[in-house]
Swiss-Prot record:
Compartment(s) of residence: Secreted
EC top class named in words: hydrolase
Function: Alpha-glucuronidase involved in the hydrolysis of xylan, a major structural heterogeneous polysaccharide found in plant biomass representing the second most abundant polysaccharide in the biosphere, after cellulose. Releases 4-O-methylglucuronic acid from xylan.
Family, per entry: Belongs to the glycosyl hydrolase 67 family.
Residues modified by glycosylation: 51, 76, 149, 222, 279, 310, 343, 450, 465, 527, 576, 682, 723, 732
Name of protein: Alpha-glucuronidase A
Pfam family, one: Glyco_hydro_67M
Catalytically driven reaction(s): an alpha-D-glucuronoside + H2O = D-glucuronate + an alcohol
One GO process term, biological-process aspect: xylan catabolic process
Alphabetically ordered keywords of this record: Carbohydrate metabolism, Glycoprotein, Glycosidase, Hydrolase, Polysaccharide degradation, Secreted, Signal, Xylan degradation
Induction cue: By xylan and xylose but not by glucuronic acid.
pH dependence: Optimum pH is 4.5-6.0.
Length: 841
């Protein structure tokens, strides 16, 4: 589909906004803005394209400009033949073509993908270093117009780094590992899908934020992607992305020569293996002549790699880099290599040290088209980690940072968490290599160590959900990733406001409210999950979603907290611990080696301290835990009130979808708060000085009610239930009733019911007070759009809350819950809470 057909598709997508706002267009809604007569007199009336061959990004730029002006301003721009100095026009060209066809123009230097934008009233010129840069300039101009910014501008902008990629962890069967927004848009049933429309729309969104490549499949790769029919399918994906200047790459399974090719080895130094990969690579480039390259995960979490044959990681990486070199491809090699069977009884054992231990001595041994892809922290996308020291240990090797837009450990898009402030703690961190300024962002750009290749990768994992990520507000993270990959000094809040204007419109209250909520969301989530550098206290052995702090310890995965009755934290000092601090340059090592100079927010990452240790804040560690978890949950409840203030200012579909998600988050934040506080109170025996932990005067424990057809059930882990116990029906096909007499004073209450919504069943509950039914609900979250990894157990993942507001209660009324079991779900209930107005518990 090309030319006018593509324009009609783009315009149809935009006009569909009149009927519905489902999020499919993201920040490219091109919603109408006001433009009076004076404003319209200063608008261009036609588009002039230079060398707009079919399917080129410049042709795409023209199509986007035409559709955008039609949608935003109801203005029909016409295409005119090329003229060098056409007035009342938008001219789009590459700089070289413009200079050849028109005249030389004195501009600041343009790097690959960079562009120059000049807007002077009705005349706009967009010149790119290449066609992709010209398209980026068109999107930049449209973003200005969509925000009702018609100012005169003239500036050049260049990318921070050449690599600005996204990674998809899509599997060949159509599932997505750590994906929370539906099934794959690329694969189904072992092959590439036929419908490329979502792929094209995804490429369009990526191009608008200046992302230049997608790795389309999971790093835990399936070798069948390399079958001829799937190579042909990759060609179709590339064809859909190419008009937007987005290249594709693929992840490889290191053992493919053996598992797919029938060889007896996958030794990277074996001539037969080398020849096999060269043949595969050459074949891929016949289908995808502009393929960006490969991504490889090796010797990690069960994935095969060069270590099988006692070969180095650089020898493994160079195997693929050599095959890519004739085609100009790049090999991204993940630094996520570690031993997942560590011995916790060894005080010196430390997973955080793995990346430097594996890669530092190989510095300078990687081919020039190899980029080592390094997670922002040394463990795994935690709510807070120190900057990976590997960035300071590779001087002669290209590097890229790996971020995660998909909220694997951070609420899985069911919790609002705006990630740029977290990313900024790493990007802006000064590693002080050789006692010189060494910002991580300057290492990524190549500026610090004089490298020409490097940059950015983010695990995104969009899916078939119309919101792409499962949540409207989560798309702010994808938008911000593109903005920061282009210009990492941009302000997180300003990026958010730009995204809000493009996504939700120009209303000042909407902009201010949505800017405030996400900007406080990461601190809130950190508060009610894991504090002081202890990591996200989620279940690392199961879903990576709900609370289960015990899973951090007593296994070989190395995400230990070393918490016991007396003390907590990892001692990573040189003097008495694992020696991890010594992997940093001297100034940073000295900062973290001392308990006195280590910031509170990382104290448990670097030091093992008593629970009664006083922080710089003056609080003890345990009291900080208690306070933070209460504060975080309070903040999550505040998000609901803030969002509800926007009712009528946002279209109903997106308003209701986001409100239900925020209500869920608030309820789950209570689950998190109580689970973590109860776990550590039980461990330490140290009470909360404010008397909150374990004290819930508004609650009625389900097991204390009169039960008929229900029985008590001891929940595991214990902290996933308010009083360690819940109730379940006596069988999975019966009905249970729980009754109690209300002792609270008569009045108006919000009544919350904490229950468990298990995967594989749809129980039905009915809540009554007196002779009135307050509400009914189903345990059907797996059929809603929440998307988080489900659980078949009563635990911190399945625990949730439903709240009925403004219920009139009389003292002495009977409160009754009737639960009808279904499937594997025995209508489980934890407790009921009667909350006076303004109380959170």
């Amino acid at each position: 589909m090309r030319g006018s057909n593509l324009f009609q598709l783009t315009l149809a997508l935009l006009l569909s906004l009149v009927a519905a706002e489902d999020g499919y267009n993201g920040w490219l809604r091109y919603a109408p803005v006001s433009c009076d007569l004076h404003c319209r007199q200063a608008l261009p009336s036609h588009i002039v394209l230079l060398n707009s061959t079919k399917g080129s990004p410049i042709e795409t730029a023209g199509r986007e400009l035409k559709a955008g002006f039609q949608s935003i301003l109801s203005t029909n721009l016409t295409f005119h033949p090329f003229q060098c100095d056409s007035s009342a026009s938008i001219l789009v060209a590459t700089l070289d073509e413009y200079r050849q066809k028109c005249r030389d123009i004195n501009l600041p230097e343009l790097d690959p993908d960079g562009f120059w934008l000049q807007s002077e009233g009705d005349t706009v010129r967009i010149l790119g270093n290449n066609a992709r840069g010209a398209l980026y300039g068109a999107y930049e101009y449209l973003a200005m117009v969509a925000q009702r910014n018609f100012s005169r501008v003239a500036y050049t902008t260049n990318p921070h780094a050449p690599i600005r990629w996204v990674n998809q962890w899509d599997n060949m069967d159509g599932s997505i590992e750590r994906g929370y927004g539906g099934a794959s848009i690329f694969f189904k049933d072992g092959t590439v899908v036929e419908d490329m429309a979502p792929v094209e729309q995804y490429a369009r969104l990526l191009a608008s934020i200046r992302i230049n490549a997608i790795v389309v499949n999971n790093v835990n790769a399936n070798a069948t992607l390399l079958l001829p029919e799937n190579m042909k399918g990759l060609g179709r994906i590339a064809d859909a992305c190419r008009p937007y200047g987005v290249q594709i790459g693929i992840s490889l399974n290191f053992a493919s020569p053996e598992s797919l090719g029938g060889l007896e080895t996958y030794d990277p130094l074996d001539p037969g293996v080398i020849a096999w990969w060269q043949n595969i690579t050459d074949s891929l480039y016949t289908y995808v002549p502009d393929m960006a390259g490969y991504l490889v995960k090796a010797d990690s979490e069960g994935q095969p790699g060069p270590d099988t044959y006692n070969r180095t990681l650089s020898q493994g990486a160079n195997l693929f880099a050599r095959a890519l070199q004739p085609h100009g491809g790049v090999l991204m090699y993940r630094a996520f290599v570690y031993n997942d069977n560590l011995n916790e009884s060894d005080w010196k054992a430390d997973r955080a040290k793995a990346a430097v231990e594996y890669f530092k001595d190989l510095d300078g041994q990687f081919y020039e088209n190899v980029v080592v892809q390094i997670k922002y922290g040394p463990i795994d996308f935690q709510v807070r980690e120190p900057t990976s020291p590997l960035f300071a240990n590779l001087y002669q090797t290209n590097t890229a940072i790996e971020l995660e837009v998909s909220q694997e450990y951070l609420g899985q898009q069911c919790h609002l968490v705006y990630l740029p402030p977290l990313w900024k703690t790493v990007l802006d961190f000064d590693l002080r290599v050789d006692h010189k300024p060494s910002m991580v962002r300057d290492i990524l750009s190549g500026q610090r160590f004089n490298r020409t290749l490097g940059g950015w990768a983010a695990v995104v994992n969009v899916g078939t959900n119309r919101t792409w990520l499962g949540s409207h507000l989560a798309m702010s993270n994808l938008y911000a990733y593109g903005r920061l990959a282009w210009s990492p000094t941009d302000d997180s809040e300003q990026i958010l406001k730009d995204w809000t204007r493009l996504t939700f419109g120009q209303n000042r209250q909407v902009i201010d409210t949505i800017a405030d909520m996400p900007m406080t969301s990461w601190p809130a989530y950190e508060n009610y999950t894991g504090n002081l550098g202890i990591q996200t206290l989620t279940d690392i052995l199961y879903t990576h979603y709900g609370p289960n702090p015990a899973t951090q310890d007593n296994n070989g995965w190395g995400q230990w907290t070393r918490a016991d009755h007396n003390s907590v934290g990892m001692d990573r000092t040189i003097s008495n611990g694992t020696g991890y601090t010594g992997q940093y340059p001297e100034e940073v090592a000295r900062l973290y080696e001392s308990l006195e100079t280590t910031p509170d927010d990382l104290v448990l990452w670097f030091h093992h301290v008593p629970w009664t240790h006083r922080l710089h804040s003056g609080l003890t560690v345990i009291q900080h835990f208690y306070n933070a978890h209460y504060a975080g949950s309070e903040a999550a409840h505040g998000f609901i009130r803030q969002w509800e203030s926007l009712k009528g200012l946002i279209d109903r579909e997106r308003y209701e979808a986001m409100r239900s998600r925020l209500v869920y988050q608030a309820g789950h934040s209570i689950v998190w708060r109580d689970a973590i506080n109860n776990f550590y109170y039980n461990m330490t025996g140290i009470p909360d000085v404010a008397g909150r932990v374990g004290h819930h005067p508004w609650r009625i424990e389900a097991e204390s009610m009169r039960l008929d057809g229900y029985q008590t059930y001891t929940v595991s882990p214990f902290e996933a239930a308010s009083n360690t116990t819940a109730i379940i029906t006596t069988s999975n096909s019966t009905t249970g009733t729980a009754r109690t007499t209300i002792k609270a004073p008569s009045g108006v209450y919000d009544i919350g019911v904490n229950y468990y919504d298990l995967y594989g069943g749809q129980s039905k509950w009915t809540l009554s007070v007196g002779d009135k039914v307050v509400g009914q609900w189903l345990g059907d979250m797996e059929h809603q759009s929440l998307g988080h990894t489900p659980s078949i157990y009563l635990d911190g993942h399945s625990a949730t809350r439903i709240t009925f507001h403004g219920v009139v209660v009389r003292q002495g009324d009977q409160l009754k819950i009737v639960g009808e079991a279904n499937g594997v779900e025995p209508a489980p209930v934890d407790y009921v809470v009667l909350l006076p107005p303004g109380v959170v518990d």
